[in-house]
Amino acid sequence: MEPSPEMKRKRRTKDKRVLRKALQCICFKKRIVVLFMEWNKTYHRRKICIIFFSVVLMSMVLCGRLVYLMLFEGKYYETQAKDLQQRERKIKAARGKILDRNGVVLADNKSVCTISVIHNQIKEPEAVIAMLVKELGIPEEKIRRRVEKYSSLEKIKSNVDKETGNRILAYGYAGVKVDEDYKRNYPYDTLASKVLGFTGGDNQGIIGLESVYDKYLEGTDGLILTTTDARGVEVDNIGEERKEPVAGNNLRTSLDANIQMFAMQAANKAYIQKEADSVSIIVMNPSDGAVMAMVDYPEFHLNEPFQLIEEYKEYEGTKKEQEYCNRMWRNQCINDTYEPGSTFKVITAAAALEEGVVSLEDRFHCPGYIVVEDRRIRCHKTTGHGAESFVEGIENSCNPVFINVGLRIGADHFYDYFEQFGLLHKTGIDLPGEASTIMHKREKIGLVELATISFGQSFQITPIQLATTVSSIINGGNRVTPHVGMQVENGDKKVIKTFDFPVQEGICREETSEKMRFLLEKVVSEGGGNKAYIEGYEIGGKTATSQTLPRSAHKYISSFLGFAPADDPKVLVLVIIRNPSGIYYGGTIAAPVAKEIFENILPYLELEQ
């Protein structure tokens, strides 16, 4: 059926409306495209401008940086570049000498070589390996590993003697370096080994004076600078630059090489004759604490410090080797404590005189023992000394007399004297590893403990502590600091530094000091220390025999402490013999050792009879 005219009209109107909308849409899209194209042109222009100005700015910054580096940092980067082309080798500085008080050299240096290789410079590796094996006696495998190792400088061996170093140098092999070096040398080898100490592979002090005064003894290493190409090969036509080493300063000590030898000979003799475990001897000036000799026998070999002494040879190559090296290096004069026994009666007597609880005329009775609380404490003379004065009690080293004196002082006051005399603190000696006093706490000291303390048992001190405290009592009452270092000198003997050691005045009265010198002279001239007596000399002293712990082991320590001249002491000697065989009484075996030392050193020191 054909549509009516009205329907046709409506359809045409609708089609026109659709067409109009389509045209409007097309026009809108066209407009958008036109706008986008206009915006795109603006965007690209802006982008180009930003990129352009960024490039210009970056160029200006880079140019400015280059100008800055060239003008202001040029030398720095030139040095950096040069460093990349330079190889440095150290020139070891000579270590300072250690001298005795008279300038005798106790430690110096031996000129040696260090052999190294530079892998990329070696042209004949097999010949180099064969030569190094032959000259150095090192297994081929070890040499080969180091020669073939890619490194700038590989050390083969240090401390090579000069003759061997010169022979290696004479081969003329490229890549083999022979550098000058120093090895510590001890002219007397075992003399004062535990005092001097030794150095390690880096030439730094390990123990003893070498360790304590290392900062003065060590020098400043020098350098050898060589120029290399891109492959690390040294350029032949450019000479080496050298920065010369600066040697260390010398240390002058209070030791006297001759007195040290006298003491060491006496210790060696006692060690052999008495089949002892060890012998320690200290010789010092009681007026200022200067140590003139210190022996702890057996000593070790300073030039071969890791070689065990004969007594420890069985431990070589075992797991205990290092343990016995440490034992061998240990200085029992300062590192170990012991019960001083009757030598401590010097301190008990001084405390009693200071406290005013005893006089030289006081009378005592010794039946051979004394009962304190539930303990029966015997005298070394089991039959007893009978009636005796305080002076005779010291001469006889009578335990009951000193127990009575200790009880008079009282635990509290006795502890105060430990503090006053400096016994509860380290002496401050300039040697490493000083041990502390082992003592009861004040509140733990009962009557039995007080009784045993009064004659030198139930507590422990070091030998240097005993020597220092007695020195302070007999020198007028000044607590000195024992020391070995005296001053630092340069190679021209100019003094750079003098060491001052503290002195505490007034630890006891001059009157007490005078009485103690009188009492101790009587011990040697008339009492138990008579085996140290030397005709023509006034010598004061005190003997001791003490047991080690545990008591059940029945091991003893025999000792004697003496000084001369008795009225004005200039030298003090302490002798300690550990676990002697046979007779072990201090007056019998330690006093004669001290006498032998006095017989040698009193004339040597020109002390008048």
Predicted regions and their residues:
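Periplasmic/cell-envelope proteins involved in peptidoglycan metabolism and beta-lactam response
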Residues: 2-311, 337, 359, 412-424, ...
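Beta-lactam-recognizing serine transpeptidase/beta-lactamase-like catalytic domain environment
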Residues: 2-8, 29-35, 107, 229-240, ...
